[in-house]
Amino acid sequence: MAGDVFGNGLLMSDKLQLVAAFNHLHIFIDPNPNPATSFVERKRLFELPRSAWTDYDTSIMSEGGGIFSRSAKSIAISPQMKERFDIQADKLTPTELLNALLKAPVDLLWNGGIGTYVKASTESHADVGDKANDALRVNGNELRCKVVGEGGNLGMTQLGRVEFGLNGGGSNTDFIDNAGGVDCSDHEVNIKILLNEVVQAGDMTDKQRNQLLASMTDEVGNLVLGNNYKQT
């Protein structure tokens, strides 16, 4: 979805229950999702040339959920949202809701985009250097998720990770969690640079280039896995 650079990580299983998500435009809430049905819909959106959370079929969402604009003055908190995310208020601003979602009792908090959303209680927002997210950022000791998965970089400060871990949370680091994707991108970019020169020279057609790229999938995958095994 728009702004969710590494959200494809949530296409790895049809058993996941995606209860909330957000990007720079919208907040997605599905308090009690059907894992299989919502997986199919996420996959449909992922395969569109361009997509936003507003393209999501809201008819399959559970009661009390919805897709809300981050520019709204306030958002009504349904009974289902209150129960799922342990929220007491009847209304919240979008920023207040995002702050509550980050602190919600869930199994997995997945960072799929850009921004630093978790710091340590000993750090100031100025220390973080991400002013756009100052109002919604939380401290590591406020997280109630069991695990943080970092598809994107710099989602937590290092001190924030330490504080989360000291309070019983599980996390690696961003450079470990997303190492496979970064390594895969490195291979992809270098191969495409090489092949583009061959195509421009007239020694290969675009169709032949695309067929060759597809045929290299398993080989590149094995190289990426090998590099990551050595790294971690």
Enumerate the predicted regions with their spans.
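Non-transmembrane, aqueous-exposed alpha-helical and coiled segments at domain scale
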Residues: 1-232
